[in-house]
């Protein structure tokens, strides 16, 4: 790969081109009409065709039909509520469980302010926010997987 030199902004020819609007925004194909009239409809119709084809060729049931006369031993919430359900299930004091549930969105609201001085977008240059995100993701996965297990195996995930 060759070494490219930076453009000289004092060059009058370059300044004239930039003044005409021939800078970095002035290359390539325009989005209208090429993308919006030709490519997008093909992608949308292809996606619809794939979904319809899969629905016709491989119809799958949503789940087993419910039996109103037999309730399960433990009723589980939707999958996106598994971590907070696990918090409520394992904490002995219900008030503490509710406070822990409230602390989840409160903690998420504080993440942008942890490194608000740091203007980098690269996650490797934002170590505090990246660490908080990775630990939060690991805890959410641990709680979510634990919510699907019986209560005696939920904290250790059945590994110990």
Swiss-Prot record:
GO biological process: photosynthetic electron transport chain
Molecular function in Gene Ontology: electron transporter, transferring electrons within cytochrome b6/f complex of photosystem II activity; electron transporter, transferring electrons within the cyclic electron transport pathway of photosynthesis activity; oxidoreductase activity
The keyword Chloroplast appears for this protein: yes
GO CC annotation: chloroplast thylakoid membrane
Protein location: Plastid, Chloroplast thylakoid membrane
Major location category of this protein: plastid
Topological type in the membrane: Multi-pass membrane protein
Keyword set, alphabetical order: Chloroplast, Electron transport, Membrane, Photosynthesis, Plastid, Thylakoid, Transmembrane, Transmembrane helix, Transport
Pfam families reported for this sequence: Cytochrom_B_C
The organism's place on the tree of life at top rank: Eukaryota
Positions of transmembrane segments: 36-56, 95-115, 131-151
Keyword set includes Nucleotide-binding: no
PROSITE patterns in UniProt: CYTB_CTER
Family per record: Belongs to the cytochrome b family. PetD subfamily.
Function: Component of the cytochrome b6-f complex, which mediates electron transfer between photosystem II (PSII) and photosystem I (PSI), cyclic electron flow around PSI, and state transitions.
Quaternary structure annotation from Swiss-Prot or TrEMBL: The 4 large subunits of the cytochrome b6-f complex are cytochrome b6, subunit IV (17 kDa polypeptide, petD), cytochrome f and the Rieske protein, while the 4 small subunits are petG, petL, petM and petN. The complex functions as a dimer.
HAMAP family: Cytb6_f_subIV
PANTHER family in the cross-refs: CYTOCHROME B (PTHR19271:SF40)
Protein name as it appears in the record: Cytochrome b6-f complex subunit 4
Organism classification: Eukaryota, Viridiplantae, Streptophyta, Embryophyta, Tracheophyta
Gene: petD
């Amino acid at each position: 790969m060759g070494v490219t030199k930076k453009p000289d902004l004092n060059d009058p020819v370059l300044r004239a081109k930039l003044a005409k609007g021939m800078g970095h925004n002035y290359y390539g194909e325009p989005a209208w009409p090429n993308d919006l009239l030709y490519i997008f409809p093909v992608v949308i119709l292809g996606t619809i065709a794939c979904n319809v084809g899969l629905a016709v060729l491989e119809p799958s049931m949503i789940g087993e039909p419910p039996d109103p006369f037999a309730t399960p031993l433990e009723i589980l919430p939707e999958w996106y509520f598994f971590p907070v359900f696990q918090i409520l299930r394992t904490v002995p004091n219900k008030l503490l469980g509710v406070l822990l549930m409230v602390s989840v969105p409160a903690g998420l609201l504080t993440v942008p302010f942890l490194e608000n001085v740091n203007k980098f977008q690269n996650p490797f240059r934002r170590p505090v926010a990246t660490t908080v995100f990775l630990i939060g993701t690991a805890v959410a996965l641990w709680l979510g997987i634990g919510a699907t297990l019986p209560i005696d195996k939920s904290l250790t995930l059945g590994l110990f």
